[in-house]
């Protein structure tokens, strides 16, 4: 469960390490984002030779949350951290690799590129 001002780890190789959530996309009164939801983020911490700059604004999709996500079969899935993957203006991945596991809910929300590049889909 990610909301405004939440800080997330970046799970791709764009060079960003940490981002701050500016807005949860999907309506004016939308407060929380879960796995598969799009958010607007500001890059707060970067690697020295990354493709993104500190302070730049980007869109991202949440791939892991500490708050559990309930599935249709009654099971729950939760992760050890909150993480996202940066997207370009067209809604495609900016990076070429994904680090760490991602949730199966991304497949249902049509983020096939992220699912195919992830080392593990839970």
UniProtKB/Swiss-Prot annotation:
Part of the 50S ribosomal subunit. Forms a cluster with proteins L3 and L19. In the 70S ribosome, L14 and L19 interact and together make contacts with the 16S rRNA in bridges B5 and B8. One of its GO terms (molecular function) is large ribosomal subunit rRNA binding. Pfam families: Ribosomal_L14 (PF00238). The keyword Transmembrane helix does not apply. Belongs to the universal ribosomal protein uL14 family. Binds to 23S rRNA. Forms part of two intersubunit bridges in the 70S ribosome. GO terms for cellular component: cytosolic large ribosomal subunit. Keywords: Ribonucleoprotein, Ribosomal protein, RNA-binding, rRNA-binding. HAMAP family: Ribosomal_uL14. SUPFAM superfamilies: Ribosomal protein L14 (SSF50193). SMART domains: Ribosomal_L14 (SM01374). This is Large ribosomal subunit protein uL14. The keyword RNA-binding applies. PROSITE patterns: RIBOSOMAL_L14. GO terms for biological process: translation.
């Amino acid at each position: 469960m990610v909301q405004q001002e939440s800080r997330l780890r970046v799970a791709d190789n764009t060079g960003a390490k940490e981002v701050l959530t500016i807005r949860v996309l999907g309506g004016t009164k939308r407060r929380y984002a879960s796995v598969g939801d799009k958010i607007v983020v500001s890059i707060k911490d970067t690697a020295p030779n990354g493709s993104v700059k500190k302070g730049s604004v980007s869109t991202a999709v949440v791939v892991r949350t500490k708050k559990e996500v309930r599935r249709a079969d009654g099971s729950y899935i939760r992760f050890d951290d909150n993480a996202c993957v940066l997207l370009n203006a067209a809604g495609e991945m900016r990076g070429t690799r994904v680090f760490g596991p991602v949730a199966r809910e991304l497949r249902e929300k049509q983020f096939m590129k992220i699912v195919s590049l992830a080392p593990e889909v839970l």
